């Protein structure tokens, strides 16, 4: 798999994306794309569509190429967790423990925290003002309520790639 940053055309097919909706707008982030040379590329952009206003997806550049990352939204902001990332063109894929935030109103990105463990396949949710990161590759669940804490390790349902942690 090539893991470089790649300019992808609009309306291309990609897999292993993460998606979330915020205020009638759909965001599809990262993923894998197979280019004309049959190389697999980790995508460094996000597609956005306001279902009431837009007739076509618009493209927003992400600070790093990501795949298998978790995503959630709260108060109109998008939060990203873990996954595999590429920061330099043709660099290696690396497990990621970064929690980053995107503000759609200002088009600004922020790094806000780091989980305890680097996670290659993750899910993210926020419940009662607490972030939970589910590691699908190693079965860990971490939570953030002021500091990161490991809440479960080797949880079988997570390791089995379940959509539900229990």
Curated annotation (Swiss-Prot):
InterPro entries: Kelch-typ_b-propeller. It comes from the Viruses. Keywords: Kelch repeat, Repeat. Kelch repeats lie at residues 25-76, 77-129. Belongs to the poxviruses Kelch family. This is Kelch repeat protein B10. The lineage of its organism: Viruses, Varidnaviria, Bamfordvirae, Nucleocytoviricota, Pokkesviricetes.
């Amino acid at each position: 798999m090539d893991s470089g940053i790649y300019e992808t055309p609009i309306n291309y097919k990609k897999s292993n994306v993460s998606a979330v909706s915020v205020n009638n707008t759909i965001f599809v982030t990262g993923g894998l794309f197979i280019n004309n040379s049959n190389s697999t590329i980790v995508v460094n952009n996000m597609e956005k569509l306001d279902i009431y206003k837009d007739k076509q997806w618009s493209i927003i550049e992400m600070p790093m190429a990501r795949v298998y990352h978790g995503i959630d939204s709260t108060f109109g902001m998008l939060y990203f967790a873990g996954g595999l990332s590429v920061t330099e063109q043709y660099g290696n894929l690396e497990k990621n423990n970064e929690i980053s935030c995107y503000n759609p109103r200002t088009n600004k990105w922020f790094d806000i925290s780091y989980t305890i463990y680097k996670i290659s396949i993750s899910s993210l949710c926020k419940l009662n003002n607490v972030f939970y990161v589910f590691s699908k590759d190693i079965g860990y669940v971490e939570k953030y309520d002021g500091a990161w804490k490991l809440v479960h390790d080797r949880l079988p349902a997570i390791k089995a790639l379940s959509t539900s942690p229990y």
